[in-house]
Amino acid sequence: MTPSLTVLGIESSCDDTAAAVLRGPEVLSSVVYGQTALHAAFGGVVPELAARAHVEKLDIAVAAALSEAVLALDQIDVIAVTAGPGLIGGVLSGVMLAKGLSAASGVPLIGVNHLAGHALTPRFTDGLAFPYLMLLVSGGHCQFLRVEGPEAFHRLGGTIDDAPGEAFDKTAKLLGLPQPGGPAVEAEARAGDPARFVFPRPLLDRAGCDMSFSGLKTALLRARDGLVSAGGGLTAQDRADLCAGFQAAICDVLVEKSRRALTQSEGVTGFAVAGGVAANEQVRSGLARLAAELDAPFVAPPLRYCTDNAAMIAWAGQEAFSAGARSGLDLSARPRWPLDNSQPALLGSGKKGAKA
């Protein structure tokens, strides 16, 4: 790694417009413009609205990141941009801006896989050495990866249907809670009894590291409908207990599947978690306890680097650029982009969902 590289990162793959400047692992600036209020009335991210908002905010985010870092564009060594996977309108907006900046300034360009940004985050936040085990858990993805290099990822398993973040979002919608669903369900669960509703733990009876979360959502829907039929509606305690039971089931699945992934990951330097769902306190604490039990160093990046941000894109671009990777002005935006092409595609693999 060349520590003196100064990298401008650009991220626009879902509903956060972000730009950041890194010099080595040092974050000189990180700007994020969210779209939560824009999509609140629709119960989820509307791709067309998200794309238009990115167009309005991308240049503002880049200007703010450069200003905060007290740098001009000609002082940047590399421009790193998310080129996929994601909602194609937003990804395309970011790629087009990055290509324009590169063409106008002569600054080299590197396209970054958004998932690689999450997977490499423990490298710049905690200096975690290769190889390590990564649980990438977000709105659109859930997979175990053995991370062996900036562009070397081996998938051990993943979700065969919904990602946990998507399940959280849909659960929030079913219970009349605001979006994004993860923080809303987590907040409700704090006042709930996780033992009142015992939801299924899918695929724990099967070997391997694959996961499934769609059945959990269906089980919660049936429990909700049963309460409504019996009592004419949901009480505040009903809602809290449903959230607590649902969250406990998600955590149990993630912890047990992580146990299996760790036991088959010889020679790793540690176990890391990243992605938006990694911001969930119960998920983080459950994984931390597991790592301590198995005597594996555990890394959970600061919350601001678990959710979508451009600092992780700048870092992933810096790692790839230092390893010799380059992109030209023919860089394409990609709605799907699996990290491990040697493995059969998971259902929906490589495409971002509601939030990642």
From Swiss-Prot:
Residues 333-356 are annotated as: Disordered. It is found in: Cytoplasm. InterPro entries: ATPase_NBD, Gcp-like_dom, KAE1/TsaD, TsaD. It holds the Pfam family TsaD. It is an enzyme of class 2 (transferase). Fe cation binds at H114, H118, D308. GO terms for molecular function: iron ion binding; N(6)-L-threonylcarbamoyladenine synthase activity. GO terms for biological process: tRNA threonylcarbamoyladenosine modification. SUPFAM superfamilies: Actin-like ATPase domain (SSF53067). Its cofactor is Fe(2+). Keywords: Acyltransferase, Cytoplasm, Iron, Metal-binding, Transferase, tRNA processing. Substrate binds at L136, V137, S138, G139, G140, D169, G182, N280. This is tRNA N6-adenosine threonylcarbamoyltransferase.
